[in-house]
């Protein structure tokens, strides 16, 4: 239905190959998930949730399927009820956040480069590592657009606290 050109098994194999190729160096993955696409069963949904756990995505953008006139899926049979789409989206978001916490906990103590983006106050900046880990770091004497080397700390539910090294 969704015009995927690959299977979950093929995707998982590519992830395994990439992780093997990078060895001890970390690699991260992000994805988008649509909940409640026409024809999605409870079993399909459970398989999708299990797949998220298997891969260990750093970030998952979850959203409910939205029926749009003029699209092929508009007339597909087995439209999923709006309440069910919303419930599945909430559940998948919770699962994705648990996975994110696990992935980011595994980064604690590691070092990486961060592109400083948004100044918050004084010397405090938000930014992202090369692996798309969101951080907040105090970087006195630096400005947005610069790259600094940091040690990653704990995840606060929004960003990883980091310190310059």
Listing of model-derived features with the role each one plays in the protein:
Residues 75-165:
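Terminal RNA-binding accessory module
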Residues 2-59, 65, 70-84:
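Conserved non-cysteine loop/helix-boundary elements of the Radical SAM core domain that shape
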């Amino acid at each position: 239905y969704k015009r995927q050109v690959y299977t979950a098994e093929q995707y998982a194999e590519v992830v395994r190959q990439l992780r093997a190729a990078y060895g001890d160096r970390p690699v991260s993955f992000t994805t988008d998930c649509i909940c409640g696409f026409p024809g999605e069963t409870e079993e399909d949904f459970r398989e999708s949730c299990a797949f998220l756990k298997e891969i260990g995505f750093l970030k998952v953008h979850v959203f409910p399927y939205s029926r749009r006139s003029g699209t092929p899926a508009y007339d597909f049979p087995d439209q999923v009820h709006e309440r069910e789409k919303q419930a599945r989206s909430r559940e998948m978001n919770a699962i994705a956040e648990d996975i994110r916490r696990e992935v980011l906990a595994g980064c604690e103590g590691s070092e990486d480069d961060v592109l400083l983006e948004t100044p918050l106050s004084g010397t405090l900046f938000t930014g992202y590592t090369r692996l798309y880990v969101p951080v907040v770091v105090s970087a006195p004497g630096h400005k947005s657009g610069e790259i600094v080397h940091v040690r990653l700390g704990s995840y606060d539910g929004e960003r990883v606290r980091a310190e310059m090294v």
